[in-house]
Amino acid sequence: MVTSRKPNKRPSMFEVAKLAGVSHQTVSRVINDSPDVSDATRARVQAAIDELGYRPSNSARALASRRSRTIGLIAGGLKFFGLISAITSIESIAREHGLFMSVMMVHEALCTQSDFDNLCDTFNEQNVDAFIFLTPTDVMFAAACRARVNQPRVIVTSTHGQMTVREGMSLISTANKRRTAMVGIDQWGAMAKVVSLLGEYGHKSALYFAGPNEWRDAHTRLDAWRKLAAARSIDSQIVRCHTWDADEAYAHMNHLLDAVS
């Protein structure tokens, strides 16, 4: 296919249509993955798109499909590796599916319902298609469940805390329950492996350093540890830490060692 077009001029959908020998509506259907296009026509349009270097306007696609192809993500715990790693993985998978991520961060311990709702309102102004909420703490989990949004939402959290997952789901309207999913790391399975390893080595006593109680992962791990350790008759002493700072755990350990010696 040979084209004549002014250099540096962004190609239009009409140029793609002319080159492919189809209507601009057909080009739009191909761009928006409509099933109402034959394979041969789709291939011809795609060849024209590739030759011209055409890139569809996101705003035009959103207008035509009534979808922004954007996911709004709210997360707490900006300074912690686990949550940053989760955001990176989610963004990578979204990009593979032709979706965009719009990310906003909140303080995981100080976030209020009003803060959370304001962020959701901002995302709604962007016409996001769905929400992902990374809720490491009880206050964020409760806010995510109470959020007044009608789009599909995925809440990433842990099973245990001041509010159970079942209690959280009860805060969501019946209509929105069908559009809500909750996922998280299998903290119980991980702790079962830890306790099993201690049993294999024949240990009968252990110190358990528990993370901040307002963090749902820490709460879940502690519940799992207590039940699983008791089942194996492991005598455990719980050392509570108020932060995830390694220096705090180190100071607790030194204090215990000094007391023993």
Q: Where does each model-flagged region fall?
A:
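Bacterial carbohydrate/catabolite-sensing allosteric modules
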Residues: M1-K6, E51, S89-S102, E108, ...
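N-terminal helix-turn-helix DNA-binding module of bacterial transcription factors
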Residues: M1-R69
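Residues at secondary-structure transition points
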Residues: P7-P11, D36, A40, N58, ...
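Short beta-strand segments enriched in small/hydrophobic residues
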Residues: L19, T26-R29, L63-K79, S85, ...
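Short loop or secondary-structure boundary microenvironments that flank
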Residues: I31, G77, M105, H242-T243
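Amphipathic helical "hinge" segments at domain boundaries
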Residues: Y54-T122, Q126-F133, R226
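Short glycine-rich anion-binding loops that position phosphate/pyrophosphate groups of nucleotides
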Residues: P136-D138
